[in-house]
C-alpha cells in the first residue's frame, strides 16, 4: 500500500507542475503579444504598458509557483506516506 501511495504522489506531483505551467504559459504569451502590439500602436504609452505587463506577468507566474508548492508538498510532506 505504501508503494502505491508513493507512486501516486510522484505522478500527482508531475501533473501538478505540468498543468500549473500550461495556463500561465499561454496567458503570458498572449499578454506579451498584446503588450507589444499596444506599444507598436502607441509608442508614447510604452512605460505604462510595460509596467502593467510586468505586474500581470508576476501574478500569472504566481500560479505556477503554487503548483510547484503543491508538487513539493506531495513529494516531501505527504501525510499519507508512513
UniProtKB/Swiss-Prot annotation:
The keyword Transport applies. The chain crosses the membrane at residues 7-27, 57-77. GO terms for cellular component: chloroplast thylakoid membrane; proton-transporting ATP synthase complex; proton-transporting two-sector ATPase complex, proton-transporting domain. Signal peptide: none annotated. Keywords: ATP synthesis, CF(0), Chloroplast, Hydrogen ion transport, Ion transport, Lipid-binding, Membrane, Plastid, Thylakoid, Transmembrane, Transmembrane helix, Transport. InterPro entries: ATP_synth_csu_bac/chlpt (IPR005953), ATP_synth_F0_csu (IPR000454), ATP_synth_F0_csu_DDCD_BS (IPR020537), ATP_synth_F0_csu_sf (IPR038662), ATPase_proteolipid_c-like_dom (IPR002379), F/V-ATP_Csub_sf (IPR035921). It is found in: Plastid, Chloroplast thylakoid membrane. It comes from the Eukaryota. It holds the Pfam family ATP-synt_C. It is a multi-pass membrane protein. CDD domains: ATP-synt_Fo_c_ATPH (cd18183). The record marks 61 as: Reversibly protonated during proton transport. GO terms for molecular function: lipid binding; proton-transporting ATP synthase activity, rotational mechanism. In plastids the F-type ATPase is also known as CF(1)CF(0). F(1)F(0) ATP synthase produces ATP from ADP in the presence of a proton or sodium gradient. F-type ATPases consist of two structural domains, F(1) containing the extramembraneous catalytic core and F(0) containing the membrane proton channel, linked together by a central stalk and a peripheral stalk. During catalysis, ATP synthesis in the catalytic domain of F(1) is coupled via a rotary mechanism of the central stalk subunits to proton translocation. Key component of the F(0) channel; it plays a direct role in translocation across the membrane. A homomeric c-ring of between 10-14 subunits forms the central stalk rotor element with the F(1) delta and epsilon subunits. Belongs to the ATPase C chain family. F-type ATPases have 2 components, F(1) - the catalytic core - and F(0) - the membrane proton channel. F(1) has five subunits: alpha(3), beta(3), gamma(1), delta(1), epsilon(1). F(0) has four main subunits: a(1), b(1), b'(1) and c(10-14). The alpha and beta chains form an alternating ring which encloses part of the gamma chain. F(1) is attached to F(0) by a central stalk formed by the gamma and epsilon chains, while a peripheral stalk is formed by the delta, b and b' chains. This is ATP synthase subunit c, chloroplastic. It comes from Porphyra purpurea (Red seaweed).
Amino acid at each position: 500500500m505504501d508503494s502505491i501511495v508513493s507512486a501516486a504522489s510522484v505522478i500527482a506531483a508531475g501533473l501538478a507542475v505540468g498543468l500549473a505551467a500550461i495556463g500561465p504559459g499561454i496567458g503570458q504569451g498572449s499578454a506579451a503579444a498584446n503588450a507589444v502590439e499596444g506599444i507598436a500602436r502607441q509608442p508614447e504609452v510604452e512605460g505604462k504598458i510595460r509596467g502593467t505587463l510586468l505586474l500581470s506577468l508576476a501574478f500569472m507566474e504566481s500560479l505556477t509557483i503554487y503548483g510547484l508548492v503543491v508538487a513539493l508538498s506531495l513529494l516531501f510532506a505527504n501525510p499519507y506516506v508512513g
